[in-house]
């Protein structure tokens, strides 16, 4: 009831609504000062926001994920949902310089004349695209930052680190690309070694710990299945069938051998079960995990890349997470999946890797591969809240909420194999609206797992992101968690299993858009350790600066441009300054802008703060740059990218994830 009253007070009481009904925006519309409202042109539609951002990756979107083109009254297509079949792959160079010659040493290519890449540097330079012309980056930003440009002759800012007379690259540091890997120069960590990746691809990786825990889990499951069968049925199964020595029973040799093997296997399972039945077999000593009052950025697929996380660290974040990685591609050594755990040195400690899986064997092997291949990880997080249809139908993400026993097996398997890395889990209130299950689930997680932290998103899967998060329920679950924890510690297993000083960290998530939200939810219940921010940190990346200062910061357009400059800088250091790297930087810059443009400046608002689900009328900023940054037009986002990456190539393609480009009824 208090939450409803608070909502009414923000919008205004009934009397004020009646008085202003002819002049003020309707409910769900951000209140803009009249002088900044731009009148609609003839035949121009009002902006209508589509706020069902699923943070879903292109690699996981297909026909299962929804998205429709409905017809409106005029019979025209109504742009809704996601662009499922968008193709943002960028055009690569026609003449590709041999990777061994990037830094000019022709002797390093072992293929010689048989190499399929260009070996003539002068020929390559003559066909290379013109250099980037940028007022913000007049010279190579990577060279200026690192004293060395990893892209060498391929750099689009080549003139800033090339001796044109001798055609020799300039370097401020003595760096041997073979002796010192490029990623270490860039300050990046968690790169899997080529040898380890090849072992995964060739299925040579020794999943020793995974095999151990899976054998234990299988024995418990078999014992559970047997306990639910009638005793006669158990005795009649081939592996446990009692033979009467007085009666000859002719059996085919193959069947006899198979029955013998099944019997031996079942007896071994029985021995394993008896050995571990009264123990917390999954318990392992872990590093301490401290999320208490930490400023946490949620895992964000596509937009939560390394440059963005690095930007958030600079702007005050304490904890960041990788984009969601799928367990099976990790186990198979897929390059694109192993790119996700990469992090910048500024992110550790406080960097977590999020994994999605549907079965215990996937969870165990993915966690063991991570624990043995990368070192700068503070936690491994099991994603049990992702609402994407494709993952849900495969049994991953929020589908685990419908099968708590499977989720528990996944968590215990991960805990057993992850060495000293803590295991955490992110969940939702449930899968169906009006049927929350998180309260009962956390009780089981306390008693049956050793998770170090639980993050609860205050929405169900069915709600997605369109309705307000239920923080009353989040607070209720936090109380239930502490009560269950206190009861468990009093039990015999609890006294041995959990240290009462290291309680399970509980983090709330959903609809945090400003420092007032952050402190209201954090201070509203002492059982909540911290608050996680997702979309609020994309729309307003300086949100943690506001949390620190406990005041709203009305960033000017110049200050916001500096934030974009940092993002562009970090992007080029990560993806590179060659043609393909610049194209990637521009693409992810536009992905970032699809949220960043939704910020409504405080100085033009009649009422502040603006809620996440409130959309503004057509507005103009206090200067031209502010207006450009608030544009919903993809072409304006590309125009902003030109400030950092030079004029857009005619072959550059960017299709926004949402057909509305965040707003519907656009003709372009």
UniProtKB/Swiss-Prot annotation:
Compositional bias (Basic residues): 70-83
Catalytic activity: 5,6-dihydrouridine(47) in tRNA + NAD(+) = uridine(47) in tRNA + NADH + H(+); 5,6-dihydrouridine(47) in tRNA + NADP(+) = uridine(47) in tRNA + NADPH + H(+); a 5,6-dihydrouridine in mRNA + NAD(+) = a uridine in mRNA + NADH + H(+); a 5,6-dihydrouridine in mRNA + NADP(+) = a uridine in mRNA + NADPH + H(+)
Basic and acidic residues: bias regions: 1-22
UniProt-annotated stretches for the region Disordered: 1-31, 59-92, 227-264
A UniProt-annotated Pfam family: Dus
ZnF (C3H1-type) intervals: 92-122, 134-164
Major place of residence: cytoplasm
Superkingdom of the organism of origin: Eukaryota
EC number(s) per entry: 1.3.1.89, 1.3.1.-
Record localization: Cytoplasm; Nucleus
Active-site residues from the entry: 386 (proton donor)
Protein's name according to its UniProt entry: tRNA-dihydrouridine(47) synthase [NAD(P)(+)]
Binding site for FMN: 299-301, 354, 426, 457, 509-511, 534-535
Entry keyword annotation includes Oxidoreductase: yes
Keyword flag NAD: yes
Gene Ontology molecular function terms on file: flavin adenine dinucleotide binding; mRNA binding; mRNA dihydrouridine synthase activity; tRNA dihydrouridine synthase activity; tRNA-dihydrouridine47 synthase activity; zinc ion binding
Described function: Catalyzes the synthesis of dihydrouridine, a modified base found in the D-loop of most tRNAs. Specifically modifies U47 in cytoplasmic tRNAs. Catalyzes the synthesis of dihydrouridine in some mRNAs, thereby affecting their translation.
PROSITE patterns: UPF0034, ZF_C3H1
Named cofactor requirement(s): FMN
UniProt family annotation: Belongs to the Dus family. Dus3 subfamily.
Keywords annotated in UniProt: Cytoplasm, Flavoprotein, FMN, Metal-binding, mRNA processing, NAD, NADP, Nucleus, Oxidoreductase, Repeat, tRNA processing, Zinc, Zinc-finger
Annotated InterPro entries: Aldolase_TIM, DUS-like_FMN-bd, tRNA_hU_synthase_CS, Znf_CCCH
GO BP, sorted A to Z: mRNA processing; tRNA modification
CC per GO annotation: cytoplasm; nuclear periphery; nucleus
């Amino acid at each position: 009831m208090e939450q409803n009253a608070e909502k009414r007070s923000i919008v205004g009481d009934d009397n004020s609504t009646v008085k202003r009904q002819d002049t003020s925006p309707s409910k769900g519309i951000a209140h803009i000062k009249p002088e900044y409202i731009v009148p609609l042109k003839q035949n121009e539609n009002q902006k209508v926001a589509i706020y069902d951002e699923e943070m879903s990756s292109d690699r996981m979107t297909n026909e299962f994920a929804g998205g429709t083109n409905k017809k409106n009254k005029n019979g025209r297509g109504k742009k809704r949902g996601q662009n499922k079949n968008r193709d943002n792959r960028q055009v690569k160079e026609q003449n590709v310089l041999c990777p061994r010659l990037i830094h000019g040493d022709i002797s390093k290519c072992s293929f010689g004349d048989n190499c399929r890449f260009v070996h003539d540097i002068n020929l390559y330079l003559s066909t290379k695209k013109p250099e980037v012309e940028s007022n913000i980056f007049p010279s190579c930003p990577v060279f200026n930052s690192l004293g060395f440009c990893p892209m060498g002759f391929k750099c689009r800012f080549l003139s800033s680190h090339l001796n044109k007379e001798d055609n020799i690259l300039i370097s401020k540091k003595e760096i041997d690309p073979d002796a010192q890997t490029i990623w270490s120069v860039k300050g990046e960590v968690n790169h899997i070694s080529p040898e380890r990746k090849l072992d995964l691809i060739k299925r040579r990786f020794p999943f020793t710990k995974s095999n151990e825990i899976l054998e234990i889990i299988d024995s418990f499951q078999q014992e559970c299945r047997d306990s639910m069968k009638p005793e006669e049925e158990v005795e009649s199964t081939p592996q446990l069938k009692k033979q009467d020595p007085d009666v000859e029973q002719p059996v085919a040799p193959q069947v006899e051998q198979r029955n013998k093997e099944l019997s031996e296997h079942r007896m071994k399972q029985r021995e394993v079960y008896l050995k571990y039945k009264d123990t917390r077999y999954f318990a392992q000593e872990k590093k301490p995990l401290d999320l208490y009052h930490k400023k946490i950025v949620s895992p964000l697929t596509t937009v939560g890349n390394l440059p963005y996380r690095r930007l958030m660290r600079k702007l005050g974040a304490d904890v960041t997470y990788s984009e969601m990685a799928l367990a099976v591609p990790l186990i198979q050594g897929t390059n694109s999946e192993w790119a996700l755990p990469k992090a910048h040195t500024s992110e550790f400690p406080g960097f977590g890797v999020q994994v999605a899986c549907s079965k215990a064997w996937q969870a165990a092997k993915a966690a063991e591969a991570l624990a043995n291949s990368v070192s700068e990880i503070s936690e491994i997080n099991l994603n049990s809240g992702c609402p994407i249809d494709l993952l849900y139908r495969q049994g991953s993400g929020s589908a685990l909420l419908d099968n708590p026993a499977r989720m528990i097996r996944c968590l215990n398997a991960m805990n057993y194999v992850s060495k000293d890395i803590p295991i955490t889990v992110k969940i939702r209130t449930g899968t169906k609206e009006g049927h929350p299950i998180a309260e009962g689930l956390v009780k089981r997680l306390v008693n049956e797992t050793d998770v170090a932290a639980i993050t609860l998103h205050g929405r169900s899967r069915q709600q997605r992101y369109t309705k307000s998060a239920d923080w009353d329920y989040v607070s209720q679950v936090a109380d239930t968690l502490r009560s269950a924890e206190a009861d468990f510690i009093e039990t015999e297993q609890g006294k041995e299993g959990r240290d009462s000083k290291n309680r399970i960290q509980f983090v709330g998530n959903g609809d945090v858009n400003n420092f007032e939200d952050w402190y209201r939810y954090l201070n509203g219940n002492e059982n909540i350790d911290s608050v996680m921010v997702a979309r609020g940190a994309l729309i307003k990346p300086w949100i943690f600066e506001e949390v620190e200062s406990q005041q709203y910061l009305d960033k000017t357009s110049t200050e916001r441009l500096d934030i974009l400059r940092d993002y562009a800088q970090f992007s080029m250091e990560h993806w590179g300054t060659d043609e393909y790297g610049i194209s990637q930087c521009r693409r992810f810059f536009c992905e970032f802008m699809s949220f960043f443009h939704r910020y409504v400046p405080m100085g033009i608002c009649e009422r502040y703060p603006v809620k996440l689900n409130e959309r503004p009328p057509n507005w103009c900023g206090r200067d031209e740059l502010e207006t450009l940054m608030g544009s919903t037009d993809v072409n304006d986002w590309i125009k902003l990218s030109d400030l950092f990456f030079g004029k857009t190539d005619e072959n550059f393609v960017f299709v926004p994830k949402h057909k509305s480009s965040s707003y519907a009824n656009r003709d372009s």
